[in-house]
Amino acid sequence: MRLTDLNSGREIGANCMLAEFGGLRLVFDCGLHPKLDGRKALPQIDKIQGSVDGVILTHCHLDHLGSLPLLLKQHPSARVYASGATTLFVRRLLSNSIQVMKRQREETGNQDYPLYVETDVERVEHALAAVPLANPRIIGRGGEEVALSFHLAGHVAGAVGCLVEHRKQKHFFTGDVHFQAQRTVAGANFPRTPVDTLVMECTRGATATAPSFNRGKEEQRLIKAINEVCDEGGSVLLPAFAFGRMQEILLLLQEAADAGNLADVPIFCSGLGLDLCDYLDEASRKTKQVKFSRQVLRDLGILPLSRKYVQPGKNMPERGIYLLSSGMLVEKTPAWRVAANMLDHEENAVFFVGYCDPETPGGELIGMNPGGEFKFKTLDHTATLRAKVERFHLSGHADRE
């Protein structure tokens, strides 16, 4: 086997890897770099020489999915192999990406956008092939063949690791992985067989986990912190990834509410994450890979976030819990916009519930001391940090240990 990393930066970004097995070429994921703009965010797919015999899509986060339409445009005969749950999410997430890129073109003038259009997304949709878990799929050409099998990775709904068997050798690609069970998905269930090559993620590889850490206790700590803020008359902003993390937190809030342990305040959600609740509900009914029901929205009385944003610096008019994307507080997202209303007010809090890149606005905020200045440049507002900011370690990535 020969591996070529096509990621355009030596960091978490546009995940894409070419794996060659004899004369067969498989591409593992094809993402967009979340911190780069335009064509700079693409993986180096032009380096692929010759045809692509198959694409393995490990899951639907955009740093693994976002450039797939461009890869299929260059290699239209390639099939895209994914879990049954993942095939249900692809079109919605890519279509949303197009809308985001169109807005970016209007706002920044970047003529690269959109990088692809709906006809390109349709090509991806037609190329999708759902592969049942632990059920080998043979891919071959010119007398060469490999056997692929998918295994639950636990990271997010539909996520899988992939075992590739070729010429009596076994190569395992973990994709993004989490071994502990979450509310929407079981923990990773990888094969115990020895492998010749292991290709693994290392998102949290440089971060040690405290020996005393317990995810259940961390969730309890989050609920307690939310209640303390709300009971004192403040509001809580929970920035969350639209796909996966928002649905996890909804179920956590429902569990706390059912037990009588959640402050009786309104809960606001908006955008893609709210829409994706329907898709996870469908995946839960059609596959055994996801555990989610949109009934949670009714049980919690979820309210939509008003499109009429409050003037930056002025507190939100209604005390409550604001569960909004994006998880890293990316500019111009609902979470970023509401943060412009909350940070100046000491009764409020911003609680991060997932991984946050240090170079994103969320990472900057986590590292800021009280009283620091946080700039919302496109809003022409500089907030003085008076709200409480804290990170809760509820990542969907495996611990280093």
Predicted regions and their residues:
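His/Asp/Glu-rich metal-coordinating catalytic cores
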Residues: 1-56, 65, 72-248, 254-261, ...
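Solvent-exposed alpha-helices and their adjacent loops that cap or buttress functional pockets
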Residues: 47-50, 189-192, 314-317, 342-343, ...
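A short secondary-structure junction signal
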Residues: 183-186, 209-211, 333-338, 362-364
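Hard-cation-handling environments
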Residues: 222-361, 377
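Generic long, charged, amphipathic alpha-helical segments
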Residues: 374-401
